[in-house]
Amino acid sequence: FSSGAAFDITRNTVLYNVGFITLNLIISIAFAIIMSELRNKKLVKVYQTMSLLPYFLSWVVISYFVYAFLAPGNKGIFNQMIMHNGGMPVNWYQEPKYWVFIILFIGVWKGIGYNSIIYFATVMGINPTYYEAAMVDGATKWQQIKNITIPQVVPLMTILTILAVGNIFRADFGLFYNVPRQSGALTPVTQVLDTYIY
């Protein structure tokens, strides 16, 4: 920690993890509640499988998917869309301003399936008589979610958040090393404790 970059690296690590924890919590719970409202059980299984698939992909594979979208010049899918609409291509791997959002999006995308299935199992375990009583009392679907579902999920939210906060100084090495493709221009926003130690 004698390096001048220690503060920036620690800040990056903590802020990315706060972003991952917050976004994963909100989106996973929302996704789990949406899945619990679906009546077609086969469709629920398809959504669960599709959302869980990224969790099993390695960061190397994901980095190649990201590169297919963000490749410089006219090779990347995003640049082709930008040029098709009359814009100039963006050299994504030389522009740090985009990478906070790219890293957050990819990290959340990879982890959301796992978390949402845990929350989905909890939501499905809620006693259905609570909802029946709420319907008899005239509660809307939103009121049922706000007054029954969310309070029943809070204990699990608390446990998972505490466990995630316990890892707040641990960054996912594969995400921060492979996805930005070790671009030196991105170091100010992608350098975290794990990559710095490496």
Tell what function each PLM region has.
Residues 1-198:
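A structural signal for multi-pass alpha-helical bundles of membrane permease subunits
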